[in-house]
Amino acid sequence: MKTLNSTPRADGFHMPAEWAPQTQVWMVWPERPDNWRLGGKPAQAAHVTLAKAIARFEPVTVAVSAGQYENARRQLDQPNIRVVEISNDDAWVRDTGPTFVINDHGEVRGVDWGFNAWGGFDGGLYAPWNRDEELAAKVLEMERCQRYQTEGFVLEGGSIHVDGEGTVITTEECLLNRNRNPHLSREQIEAVLRDHLAVDTVVWLPDGLYNDETDGHVDNFCCYVRPGEVLLAWTDDSNDPNYARCHAAMDVLKNTRDAKGREFIVHKMPIPGPLFATAEECAGVDQVAGSQERDPSVRLAGSYVNFLIVNGGIIAPSFDDPADAEARAILARIFPDHEVVMIPGRELLLGGGNIHCLTQQQPAPVKR
C-alpha cells in the first residue's frame, strides 16, 4: 500500500454515492465494556443480526480483536461473511474506517482521515484511540488500496453524505466544532472536503439530532436517497428539542441548490420516541473515567435515518416504536427497487449510534 502525497480530486478520484454498486461492507466487532452493556454480549448478538442481514445482499467483512476472534468467527460462520483480525478501540467503522474513492478506470483508493474519538480531550468519548486511528490504514492495506492521508485534519465518515455528483451535506455542529479542527476556518475545511471527496458544493446544516454524542453527525439526521433528494429526520412537536433543528435544516435545504443547480426534494422521516435507556441497561455498562457515561435520564438520539444502502437492499433500524411501520413504508416508497429489511436497533443505539455508524461500504470499481 502506498501513501500518496496528492489528493483524490487531483488524481481524478471521487467519493461515490452510497447507492453505487458495492463489493462489500465493513464492520467491527463490539466488545468495549465501558460502552456496550454486559461486556458487549447483547451488542454482539445485534451485530450478528446486522451482518447476516447485509450478507443476504453482498459480502461482509468483520474486523475483530485477537481476543474476540474465535467468538466472532463462531457466531458469524456463514459463506458471505469474512472475519479478519484487526486491533481496534471500538466498533464505529463509519468513523474510523477509510472513505473509499473511485475513478473511471477501475481503481479504488481510500482516504484516511484523522480520528480523535469525537473530540479528543475536549468532549471525546474515550481514550486512548490510537488503535482506531490505525484502522483505516490497515483496511486499505488488506484491500491493496492506495491511501490518501489527511494529517492534521480530523473527520468522521458519519459527518458527511455525498450524492456522487458534486455535493456533500454536513453539519456546522460537528465540522465547525472546536474539538475537531480548531486551527481551520470554515473555508479551509470546505477546501479539504472539495479536494478529498471531489465535490463542488458543501451544504451546511446548522445542527444534527438532539443529544447526538458525536456532535451532530449528519448520517443520523439527513441523508441522500438519490441525486437532488434527501431524507430528513422530522417532528411536528414544537416541544421536542429536535423541532428547531429539523426546521432550521429544512430552511437551509429549501434555499440551497446542489452542484448541478437542482432544488432539493426533501422527504420527512418521523423521529422515534423519545427513547431512553433503562436504569438496568445503564447499570450494565462499566463506568470508566474518560469514557461516555450512560444515564437513563438522557434522551437517546434514535433515528430511522441511520440506515445503510446495500446492493438491492435497505438495512434499517426498528425500535419497537409506533413509528416503525411508517418508517418502513417511507423507505419502501423512496426505494422501490430495494428490499427494506428492518432489524432491532435498540442495542446499537444504547452504544451511541446505529446501523450506518457501524458499517462502511466499499464501492465496486467502475470503468467508463
Swiss-Prot record:
Domain of life: Bacteria
GO biological process: putrescine biosynthetic process from arginine
Major enzyme class: hydrolase
EC number, as in UniProt: 3.5.3.12
UniProt keyword terms in alphabetical order: Hydrolase, Polyamine biosynthesis
One Gene Ontology MF term: agmatine deiminase activity
Function in brief: Mediates the hydrolysis of agmatine into N-carbamoylputrescine in the arginine decarboxylase (ADC) pathway of putrescine biosynthesis, a basic polyamine.
Subunit structure: Homodimer.
Protein name: Agmatine deiminase
